[in-house]
Curated annotation (Swiss-Prot):
Matches recorded under InterPro entries: YmcE_antitoxin
Bilayer topology: Single-pass membrane protein
Transmembrane domains' residue ranges: 12-32
Pfam families hit by this protein: YmcE_antitoxin
Organism classification: Bacteria, Pseudomonadati, Pseudomonadota, Gammaproteobacteria, Enterobacterales
Keyword RNA-binding in record: no
Any single Gene Ontology cellular-component annotation: plasma membrane
UniProt protein name: Uncharacterized protein YmcE
Length: 76
């Protein structure tokens, strides 16, 4: 696991990666507010389109998509 992360970090510009993750979690965390989530998805779509060109990030994003909504739903 540690080896997989280090290999992908070498290929990724760290700034772009963390900005994309930030936009992604902002969009998921404000599911209850439709107007805000539409704005956040616009930013997220641009960043994900950049990240999907990098090998390995599709798996990371898929894991976030699957895990995060369950955490949000469990709070209500």
């Amino acid at each position: 696991m540690h080896r997989w992360i280090s290999q992908n970090n070498i290929r990724l510009p760290c700034g772009a990666f963390f900005i994309s993750v930030l936009f992604f979690f902002n969009a998921v965390c404000i599911v209850s507010d439709n107007l805000l989530i539409i704005e956040s998805f616009g930013e997220m779509a641009y960043n994900i389109s950049y990240l999907t060109r990098v090998p390995g990030t599709n798996t990371l994003l898929a894991c976030c998509c699957l895990l995060r909504p369950e955490e949000v739903n469990s709070e209500y």
